[in-house]
Amino acid sequence: MRHRQRPGCEAAIEKHSLEGTRWLICTPSWQHPARAAAKLFGLETAEDDVISSVMEIDETTGCLTGKIETVAYGDGKYEVTKKWCDRNGVDLKDCVFYTDSMSDVLLMEHVGTPVAVNPDARLRAFAKERGWQIVDWGVAEARARKPRYSYGCLNFGGSHVGPG
């Protein structure tokens, strides 16, 4: 996962860590890859330091049920982040939030320091209009070497498809 990280991200993490600032990952990704990323970035407790979309897990089997509990995307990212802050006694106005996505504007509008990272033209214009900080974190190693790709997921109605 580190090969997909923009160079400026590591500098920001180091800066906030040296200042003694608690930082977390807030992503629309599902809980499992989000927690794996948190561990790679050295977060103390991946459970507490990750705000992500959550798929329901069957308590009995430990398997994913296919049901979505939480979506941390768009307005949903604001909602789950606000809940996390309320649970942890954190005021959103004391937070710095870095994003490269226009879908995160609602959360950007509620934090004290919104930062647009490598924004596209639309987010750049929006950030400029509001006087938000705009930064360039460079290009991730993986993106420098190969074109963008997307992921797909197939759901076969909960059945297991495989040999035999």
Predicted stretch roles:
Residues M1-G164:
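C-terminal cap/substrate-recognition subdomain and adjoining C-terminal extension
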